[in-house]
């Protein structure tokens, strides 16, 4: 309750759920501790979430509506990203595998390093500015599996300067 800021002290596992009424728009900034979480879940609905840094072994981000902006994400385990009709922007500096499901929203991801992306059938996705389609292979543990039937996904695998 500090002008829309939520400051979280170190805990091993955390679930943050933000639900607001649709006619109101809230911007909530979350300051997380420097040490990584073993399990971190960030869920937003009809609100705007902004995080400077997120670090954890298992990180799940779900954006039903509204937006989620994450300036730096480090995930040493499994990453789960689920966007319904909202917008997610994030920069990922550590990644070891996971999935991205986007229904009708917009997802923009910048990777610090090259990341192997596996696209499912019927998905619209742009990788490094070029339209990408499924090559028919199955995702492995260290891949980012992307499913987006009618939303927009943009992925850059360039080093952020």
Which ranges hold each PLM region?
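Short, surface-exposed interaction patches in beta-rich subdomains
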Residues: 70-161
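Generic recognition of long tandem-repeat/solenoid scaffolds
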Residues: 4-16
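Right-handed parallel beta-helix
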Residues: 40-84
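A mature extracytoplasmic/lumenal domain signature
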Residues: 10-12, 34, 46, 55, ...
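Extended Gly/Ser/Thr-rich low-complexity repeat segments
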Residues: 15-35
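Short, ordered beta-strand-loop transition motifs
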Residues: 1-7, 138-139
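Structural motif
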Residues: 2-3, 45, 64, 84, ...
């Amino acid at each position: 309750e500090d002008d829309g800021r939520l400051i979280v002290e170190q805990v091993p596992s955390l679930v943050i759920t933000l639900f607001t009424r649709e006619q109101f728009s809230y911007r909530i900034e979350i300051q997380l501790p420097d040490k990584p979480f073993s399990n971190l879940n960030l869920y937003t609905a009809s609100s705007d979430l902004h995080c400077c840094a997120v670090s954890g072994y298992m990180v799940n981000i779900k954006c039903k509506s509204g937006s989620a902006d994450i300036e730096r994400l480090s995930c040493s385990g499994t990453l789960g990203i689920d966007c319904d009709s909202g917008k997610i922007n994030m920069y990922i500096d550590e990644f070891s595998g996971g999935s991205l499901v986007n229904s009708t929203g917009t997802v923009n991801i910048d990777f610090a390093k090259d990341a192997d992306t596996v696209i499912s059938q019927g998905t619209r996705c742009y990788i490094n500015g070029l339209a990408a389609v499924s090559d028919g292979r199955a995702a492995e543990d260290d891949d980012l599996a992307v499913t987006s039937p009618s939303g927009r996904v943009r992925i850059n695998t360039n080093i952020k300067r």
